[in-house]
Amino acid sequence: MREVISIHIGQAGVQVGNACWELYCLEHGIQPDGLMPSDKTIGVEDDAFNTFFSETGAGKHVPRAVFLDLEPTVVDEVRTGTYRQLFHPEQLITGKEDAANNYARGHYTIGKEIVDLCLDRIRKLADNCTGLQGFLVFSSVGGGTGSGLGALLLERLSVDYGKKSKLGFTVYPSPQVATAVVEPYNSVLSTHALLEHTDVAVMLDNEAIYDICRRSLDIQRPTYTNLNRLIAQVISSLTASLRFDGALNVDVTEFQTNLVPYPRIHFMLCSYAPVISAEKAYHEQLSVAEITNSAFEPASMMAKCDPRHGKYMACCLMYRGDVVPKDVNAAVATIKTKRTIQFVDWSPTGFKCGINYQPPTVVPGGDLAKVQRAVCMISNSTAIAEVFSRIDHKFDLMYAKRAFVHWYVGEGMEEGEFSEAREDLAALEKDYEEVGTESQEGDGEEGEDGGDQ
């Protein structure tokens, strides 16, 4: 088997994780107590869904996942929620005091005490796998736990499981809405680790997803649950081909191979279509061409950044439901003729498509309508540099005055780390700039490590 272990860190990671496992269970017909009436091979782990669930002899299906937080309240909701019987108590790890939105607390003082316990639990899950293919890591970089403990854990995973791929689903701070004043510091420090220790990072941002909920689902005041269910659909689409047998299956490492032209250029934009509310669904039957066009709309992007301002380097389209390759080819051909969708000159083809015949499932009583077919797009575009330059700008404004820095230094961090991380991000922005420029004159090798100051 090619198993995948999911690691959910901090409030954002745990809440997105909740939404994901809720959806996986519905998709596979697994009950909240872990039993699966439709599973004929009890205790035998050779079904496709066993990449994400392990099975006990009694026929209980247990997610291959760990939930970690430095304070208990959010994970306690899992411990007492609908799916409390699904998880083994050891998979839910909490500390006693939180990281207080401080990267240094998550990475040095408090995170350091809990990280070995986390790694032990992950090791137990890994030992239970026959052919572990990688990790999915869910966190946000604005707070303290997701950024600090997340970075620490990724560093340690690189040491322990060097060759396994690590995909990050990372919530980045939004341009207008902030939950903490020190978000820019935490984000810059954490991205420094994401750059080195993840193979692919999919960037999400709450504001962009709020807008999608408001615009497409007519939810006036979206809650985190609304947001997370939408994120769960994206993640479910990406992992569908690992969990179901399909026509064009896509492996975790395949994302990496097809989307990452240079090791550092691995921050992805994602979008999902169709996002329609149950009321509207009765009147619209969306064709493959329509949902494909909709996935390329700037308004569908799950991070606030406009792909029209950049060029695409590569793009993955994951279809699910009633879709045939012929329609996909036609839709992609149409996209290629559009002037607004530009590819870099050194990547003329740039499309990888996957098709999975399992139609999208929706959470009963949720906001999304049940549809026949859906598509999720992950793209590597130079426009994502907008997200970094926005955060860097905010970082510079605060750091010029050394505002709030004492909280970080007081937790045992050195001030030099700030400037080191900031320089790394400046180099990253420069890399993106170089990758997007015409490459006739060079030999196409720039952008590999260009822009080190």
From Swiss-Prot:
Keywords carried by this UniProt record: Acetylation, Cytoplasm, Cytoskeleton, GTP-binding, Hydrolase, Magnesium, Metal-binding, Microtubule, Nucleotide-binding
CDD domains assigned: alpha_tubulin
Domain of life: Eukaryota
UniProt biased composition (Acidic residues): 431-453
Alphabetical list of SUPFAM superfamilies matching this protein: Tubulin C-terminal domain-like (SSF55307), Tubulin nucleotide-binding domain-like (SSF52490)
UniProt binding sites for Mg(2+): 71
Active site location: 254
Cofactor or coenzyme needed: Mg(2+)
Assembly and binders: Dimer of alpha and beta chains. A typical microtubule is a hollow water-filled tube with an outer diameter of 25 nm and an inner diameter of 15 nM. Alpha-beta heterodimers associate head-to-tail to form protofilaments running lengthwise along the microtubule wall with the beta-tubulin subunit facing the microtubule plus end conferring a structural polarity. Microtubules usually have 13 protofilaments but different protofilament numbers can be found in some organisms and specialized cells.
Designated name of the protein: Tubulin alpha-1/2/3 chain
Organism: Naegleria gruberi (Amoeba)
Biological classification of the source: Eukaryota, Discoba, Heterolobosea, Tetramitia, Eutetramitia
